[in-house]
Amino acid sequence: MALNLQDKQAIVAEVNEAAKGALSAVIADSRGVTVDKMTELRKTAREAGVSMRVVRNTLLRRAVEGTEFECLTDTFTGPTLIAFSNEHPGAAARLFKEFAKANDKFEIKGAAFEGKIQDVDFLATLPTYDEAIARLMGTIKEAAAGKLVRTFAALRDKLQEAA
């Protein structure tokens, strides 16, 4: 079914709004993936705070114009599935990477974060906010415990020298 001008403008506006509010974007080619698998992916994406859409390349180029995802325009070839991460920068990359492992016909074309093309593996391994806080607390706790051990060792050595 051919889209009229108003429909095209609505799609461009909708994708542009999604791009402006997104933290990162991932582009993929979903040719050969069954409808059931794609429905499952869309459901998982909604739960993860990822918005997905299949968009014509010409409309997608116009939609990302002036956003930090304009760097992805070279990857807009063939059928294009774009996913925007709204809550965590690595959510879409992690979701697509896991889906690609189970579906060999699903091909990830590229990803963008902070206005630059990024490696999908880099984005997928970014820790969530809670994971980052846990790592930071572990590092602080480890450093404090290490300092306490060194202080006790120095005190023990000083007492042994005095005796």
UniProtKB/Swiss-Prot annotation:
The keyword Cell cycle is annotated on this UniProt entry: no
The keyword Amino-acid biosynthesis appears for this protein: no
Coiled coil: none
Gene3D superfamilies: 3.30.70.1730, 6.10.250.2350
Domain of life: Bacteria
GO cellular component: large ribosomal subunit
One GO BP annotation of this record: translation
GO MF, any single term: large ribosomal subunit rRNA binding
Database matches in Pfam families: Ribosomal_L10 (PF00466)
Keywords assigned: Ribonucleoprotein, Ribosomal protein, RNA-binding, rRNA-binding
PROSITE patterns per UniProt: RIBOSOMAL_L10 (PS01109)
Function: Forms part of the ribosomal stalk, playing a central role in the interaction of the ribosome with GTP-bound translation factors.
PANTHER family per the UniProt record, alphabetical: 39S RIBOSOMAL PROTEIN L10, MITOCHONDRIAL
Record-linked NCBIfam families: PRK00099.1-1
HAMAP family with a match to the protein in the record: Ribosomal_uL10 (MF_00362)
Assembly notes: Part of the ribosomal stalk of the 50S ribosomal subunit. The N-terminus interacts with L11 and the large rRNA to form the base of the stalk. The C-terminus forms an elongated spine to which L12 dimers bind in a sequential fashion forming a multimeric L10(L12)X complex.
Family statement: Belongs to the universal ribosomal protein uL10 family.
Protein's name according to its UniProt entry: Large ribosomal subunit protein uL10
Organism encoding this protein: Mannheimia succiniciproducens (strain KCTC 0769BP / MBEL55E)
Taxonomic lineage from the root: Bacteria, Pseudomonadati, Pseudomonadota, Gammaproteobacteria, Pasteurellales
Gene that produces this protein: rplJ
